Amino acid sequence: MEKYKEVFVFISAAVAAYFDTTITFVYALLIGFAFNVLAGLRADEVKITMTRFPNFGILNYRGDKLVDSLKELGLITFITYMIKAIVDLMKFDDKSAYAVQILIGIAIYYYLKNGLRNLTKAYPKVRWIRMLYYLVSFKFK
C-alpha cells in the first residue's frame, strides 16, 4: 500500500505542477461562470424560500439550464487544456500559458456578455445595466 501512496503523490504533484501556471485563469473563469449562472437565475425569476435552516425550496426552477451550463464550462476547460497540452508538446517555451490566457479571456467575455443580457431581462428599467450590456456587446443604438 505504501508503494501506491508514493505513486499517487508523484502523479498528483506532477498534475499540480502542470496546472499551476494557469490555475488563476481557471479561477477567473469560475467567477465569470458564477456571475452568468446567478444572472440567469435572476432573469428566470427563480425564488429561494427558507422554511427551516437546513431545508429550503426553489420555486420556478428547472435544472436543465444549469446542467447545460456546467457541460459548457467543462467543454471550455477541456478544450483549453487540450490546446495547452498540444502547444506544450510542440516544445514552445511557456507559450501555452498565453494560449490558455486568450481562450479563457474569450470565455469570460462570453460569460460577461450573457450575464449582462440576463440582467437586462431581470431589471429592464435600470439603464446603467442596459448601457453596460450595449457597451460590452458592441450594440450601439
Task: Mark where each language-model region is.
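Membrane-water interface at transmembrane helix exits
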Residues: A39, A43-D44, T80-D88, F92, ...
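Juxtamembrane helix-capping/reentrant segments at transmembrane boundaries
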Residues: M50-L75
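Transmembrane helix interruption/hinge and helix-loop junction motifs
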Residues: Y18-F25
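Alpha-helical membrane-embedding segments
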Residues: D68-L75, A85-L89, W128-K141
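Hydrophobic alpha-helical transmembrane segments of multi-pass integral membrane proteins
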Residues: E6-A14, L30-G32, S69-A85, Q101-Y111
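Membrane-water interface of transmembrane alpha-helices
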Residues: A34-M50
